[in-house]
Every structure is written in structure tokens, then in C-alpha cells.
Amino acid sequence: MPGVIERFEPLASAYDVLLCDVWGVVHNGVAAFAEAGDALARFRARGGTVILITNAPRPGAAVRKILDGLGVRRDAYDAITSSGDVTRGIVEAKRAERVFHLGPPRDRPIFAGLDVTFAPLETADYVVCSGLFDDTVETPESYREMLALMRER
């Protein structure tokens, strides 16, 4: 059985690029993990490239602002790639189609600056799901009927 890896440094020399998750790795939602930032900065100082990856439904620029607010060191990474960035690319490619956005208003920056036509679910060509409309009171079960309608279409 493999042992526990307590530090990245012993492995670092075998890699040129590090894809590093954000939540739970470089921060805990309240503050940055200083040791993680230090390790990533050392990797970069030795010539490595660090790409932060996240499933946050926001563009990388918005994620960067959040990381700044949490105290994540900017010298700990080279770039950020988010599911929001990937979503924007898909929406841009489908600009002639109508979209239904299933998600809270705080996730609307996904669409900022894009030529997008929003439509009700019944007439939309596709759905972008970034979360629940209100995750303070809803659960996935709240969407059973809506998801069934999507499946039928």
C-alpha cells in the first residue's frame, strides 16, 4: 500500500506543470492555506507552471478576485481555469441558440459579454446548469419535475 505523501517537494522535480484544485487545497472557503501557497510558489520559482483548476461556475477572473479576498498568493499560480471558463466557450459556440440558465443570479457572470439569448425552459435549445436557484432552501429533489421535462425534450 502506498504511503502518505506529506509534502509536494520530493515529487516536484518530476513535473513541469501542476494542475492544482482550489477548494480544500489552496483555501478552505474562509482563508488561504499558507503552506500550500508557499509550496506552489517554490515550485514556480524552480521553473514549474501552476494552473489552478476549479469547478466554480464563474470565469477565472472572478475566481481570482475571490482568491485575492481569501489571501491566496498571486505568485503561487500562473493561471486559473474554471468550469465557468469552459461554459463560456460552449455558450459562445452556441450563440445562435437559446439558453435556459438553471442557477442563482450570482452565477450570471458566466454570460457577461457574450451574445446570448435567454429563453424559458420550454423554448430553450439547451440548458446551462450552474447550481440551484436558491441553495439556502432548495435541494436537488426540488428540481425533479424540471429535470423530467428536460429529459423528455
Which residue stretches match the model-derived regions?
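HAD-like aspartate-dependent phosphatase fold
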Residues: M1-R153
